[in-house]
């Protein structure tokens, strides 16, 4: 049987590989230099590959445990929405990654939305801890 991920756009396939393996070193090759990252816990968009990679690396550590999984996806020509669920300290987190990519298949937009409020609060705490290391 064919792997359904093989039919996904290259940027989304690569993101799935990173999310699944936790290989944060692969972010540099995947992110566009002018990528914009929008976090559910930071008011302003974060612009540029270095800062986006920092936030995404922390998110992979915080969210990417054994409980993390994508449960649905909607894919368009240059963007996708990936719904995920995970568990942190007994709190169920439900979120959506909205990802855009350029003609070179580099991610140029990454927005994370999370619910419920308890999830945002624990995510804020854990991200602050991860970013301070």
Segments from the language model and where they lie:
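Short, low-complexity N-terminal intrinsically disordered segments enriched in polar/charged residues
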Residues: 1-29, 33, 128-133
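Short N-terminal micro-motifs specific to bacterial/archaeal maturation
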Residues: 2, 18, 42-43, 98
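A beta-strand edge to alpha-helix "cap/lid" segment located at domain peripheries
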Residues: 2-3, 57-133
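A solvent-exposed, acidic/Ser-Thr-rich amphipathic alpha-helical stretch
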Residues: 5, 24-26, 30-77
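Secondary-structure boundary/capping motif
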Residues: 9, 32, 49, 53, ...
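Residue-level detector of alpha-helix boundaries and kinks
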Residues: 11-12, 37, 41, 84
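Compositionally biased, intrinsically disordered low-complexity segments
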Residues: 15, 44-45, 117
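Short glycine/serine/threonine-biased micro-segments
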Residues: 20, 46, 93
